[in-house]
């Protein structure tokens, strides 16, 4: 069984963290329906052992960071807050690239201000190339150099990447030390298998998003059947599979519900047998 912790930057974090995206309003735009509930979810997450929170100032925009500050400031020493830059929101709630030096610098300062911090623990460069929905090839040298300069200025402790290809990871590692990569990955969507193993070899965290994303009905049925046999939810099984997939995988499931938060956190105690793992591994081939 893999360890329940992994080093992210210079801190050891619990591998089951929390993603704050769903704390904003519908479509990750505007304020939440109930700010008090959002604050309660964050405080309960820490009470359940979460010490790794994933956020961004373009969630809302500004909303999730402001709620995190209201709920948790002053922050405990063992809490790692990871944020992202490289995108912005249009007035119509669209997601737009924000890769110019001025936009990247503004994003870092917006995150600092709204989180109430003098330095950011980890900043992921969110890459939006091609259609912006999945990784696409293209140089990220210019953008990463801007982020590395802000690291040298003391505004950012550690640098990560999001929505990137293996070629971009290699390019980035020539410019700065990379502590994490955040891409889409789950039982059904396993394009990053080789990347995960390579990053694990080098002690770099891999943070998958959309743990139930991109499933066909057949794949969902298989997962549901496995979950039912274990007395668990499909999400719990999907999260448990990820935890057992590789020791460098850190999870950031998001929710705006305390009940769902508790369900997600219970996945840490769910051990999947070799037989169950084999069945789940077959999902990506269906």
Swiss-Prot record:
GO MF annotation, one: pyridoxine:NADP 4-dehydrogenase activity
EC number(s) recorded for this UniProt protein: 1.1.1.65
Keywords linked to the UniProt accession: NAD, NADP, Oxidoreductase
InterPro entries: Aldo-Keto_reductase, NADP_OxRdtase_dom, NADP_OxRdtase_dom_sf
Catalytic function, reaction form: pyridoxine + NADP(+) = pyridoxal + NADPH + H(+); pyridoxine + NAD(+) = pyridoxal + NADH + H(+)
Residues annotated as the enzyme's active site: 59
Catalytic EC class: oxidoreductase
A GO-annotated cellular component: cytoplasm
Domain of life: Bacteria
GO biological process, any: pyridoxal 5'-phosphate salvage
Record CDD domains: AKR_AKR13B1
Residues involved in NADP(+) binding: 210-218
Annotated Pfam families: Aldo_ket_red
Membership in a protein family: Belongs to the aldo/keto reductase family. Aldo/keto reductase 2 subfamily.
Reported function: Catalyzes the NAD(P)H-dependent reduction of pyridoxal to pyridoxine in vitro. Is not able to reduce 4-pyridoxate, and to oxidize pyridoxine or pyridoxamine. Has Kemp eliminase activity towards the non-physiological substrate 5-nitrobenzisoxazole, producing 4-nitro-2-cyanophenol; this activity is not considered to be physiologically relevant.
NCBIfam families: PRK10376.1
Protein's UniProt name: Pyridoxine 4-dehydrogenase
Naturally occurring in which organism (per UniProt): Escherichia coli (strain K12)
């Amino acid at each position: 069984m893999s360890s329940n912790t992994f080093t992210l930057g210079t801190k050891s974090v619990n591998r089951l963290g929390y993603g704050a995206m769903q704390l904003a309003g519908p479509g990750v735009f505007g304020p939440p329906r109930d700010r008090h509930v959002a604050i309660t979810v964050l405080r309960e997450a820490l009470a359940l052992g979460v010490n790794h929170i994933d956020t961004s100032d373009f969630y809302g925009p500004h909303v999730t960071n402001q709620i995190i500050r209201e709920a948790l400031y002053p922050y405990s020493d063992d809490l790692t807050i990871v944020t992202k830059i490289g995108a912005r929101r249009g007035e119509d709630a669209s997601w737009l690239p924000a890769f110019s030096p001025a936009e990247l610098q503004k994003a870092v300062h917006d995150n600092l201000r709204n989180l109430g911090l003098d330095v950011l623990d980890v900043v992921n460069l969110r890459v939006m190339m091609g259609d912006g929905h999945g990784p696409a090839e293209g140089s990220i040298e210019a953008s990463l150099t801007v982020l590395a300069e802000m690291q040298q200025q003391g505004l950012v402790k550690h640098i990560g990447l999001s929505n990137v290809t293996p070629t971009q990871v290699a390019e980035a590692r020539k410019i700065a030390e990379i502590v994490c990569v955040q891409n889409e990955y789950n039982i059904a969507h396993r394009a990053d298998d080789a990347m995960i193993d390579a990053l694990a070899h080098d002690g770099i965290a891999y943070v998958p998003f959309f743990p139930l994303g991109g499933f066909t009905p057949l794949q969902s049925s298989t997962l549901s059947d496995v979950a039912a046999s274990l007395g668990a939810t499909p999400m719990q099984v999907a999260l448990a599979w990820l935890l057992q997939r590789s020791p460098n995988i850190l999870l950031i499931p998001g929710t705006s519900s305390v009940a769902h938060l508790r369900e997600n956190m219970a996945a840490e105690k769910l051990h999947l047998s070799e037989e169950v793992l084999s069945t789940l591994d077959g999902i990506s081939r269906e």
